Amino acid sequence: MSFKKLNIPLKEALERLKIENPLPFQKQILPKIKSGRDLFIVAPEGSGKTTALVISTIQKLESAAFEDAPRALIFVQNKEAALALEEEFNKFTKYMDLRVYSAHDAPDISKQKDDIYDGVDIVIATPKKLFQLFKITGINVSQLKILAVEDAEFLTKNSDYNDLIRIPQHITKCQYLVFASTMNPKIERLKDSFMARAEMLRLKV
């Protein structure tokens, strides 16, 4: 898949960032993500997984804000990963009205709930924080289109894994994406939960 098939605001963002062509693995996975399938996406660092996640999420949300409920939830390991991914999204969405919000393990959960209630499109958070917000009705999943896990190796921690699998139980329909550098038994176990129908995509070398 070339970048020519992306929507105009996203193509303009890529031009501004001087990203001219997809990397080989991105060519392989971008059409699969666009198809709406649930996917395990496994490739080493440097293969372009994070950029593919950002591009695919923005494309799926049509590069524009819509109502107030989040349409994308992205799980990450910790505060540093949440802020880094938020910064990456902000590079692409600088001239769009998409609203990106990172809810990391800061103490004031009531403020985070209010911020999200005011209207966001993409929420980036740790499993613990998202589940805490969900328990106090701080996350409305009725409009959700995509749920992704970035660098899923961190799920070896039981508390992260358990918090993660609880939220999809309340989601009627959305696309699930799990990105990882390598597979491990804990990631494989997601097949027993919300990744039951997922296809495995590995970097072809």
PLM feature segments, named:
Residues 67-125, 129:
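Conserved nucleic-acid-binding Ia/Ib motif block in the N-terminal RecA-like helicase ATPase lobe
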Residues 1-42:
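Conserved pre-motif I regulatory segment
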Residues 27-39, 49-67, 90:
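Walker A/P-loop NTP-binding motif
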Residues 32-33, 63-68, 93-95, 114-118, ...:
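Conserved catalytic network of the ASCE P-loop NTPase/AAA+ motor domain
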Residues 39, 72, 100, 146, ...:
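Hydrophobic/aliphatic anchor position in the core parallel beta-sheet
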Residues 43-47:
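The conserved Walker
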Residues 141-205:
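Post-DEXD/H (motif II) to motif III coupling segment of the RecA-like Helicase ATP-binding lobe
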Residues 126-141:
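Conserved RecA-like ASCE ATPase "motif II neighborhood" in helicase/translocase motors
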